[in-house]
Amino acid sequence: AEVEDIYRPYKQKRRTRATIAREKGLAPLAKLLLSQTVTSGTLEALAAPYVNEEKGVMSTDDALAGAGDIIAETISDDAAIRAALRRLYRTRGVLWAKAATDEDSVYRLYYDYREPVSRVQGHRVLAVNRGEREGMLKAGVEIEDALALQEIRRAVFRGISISNAFVNACCEDAWRRLIE
């Protein structure tokens, strides 16, 4: 998994919103906002030089939206963040399962099942996996959004900047749209 995380930013991807934003020349704006080094002015003033109707960037809002997509993808591709979230899933995650159909089956014990990942027994994981494979269960591992966002913010934030609120929104977008 660690090797996959390291390789992930270089892996060939389908055309994402971030890819389109990079094609429009918004990567330098994203890098500037993510660096969190600008302490005066406004985001609109930073984005104004990137407005280019020929490339499809019609307004500062378009430029900021594209830069936000790039930042969110950068966050989601970061190997250290993915490793921290994986640790969080192992220590604070909850394995859940519920019935996928109305039929009664040998998996009825797992029709409304929740157990912390750190305490789950191996045979239960195998049973849930088997039930999911057979189409009798839906299952997954979840963690609290607040814990995941705290880990992401810990890795991303560098200090006080005019782009802090914007980068925070990008962290939430990365978590909800790309990682979770």
Q: What are these regions, as identified by a protein language model?
A:
Residues 1-180:
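Duplex nucleic acid-engaging cores and interfaces of nucleic-acid transaction enzymes
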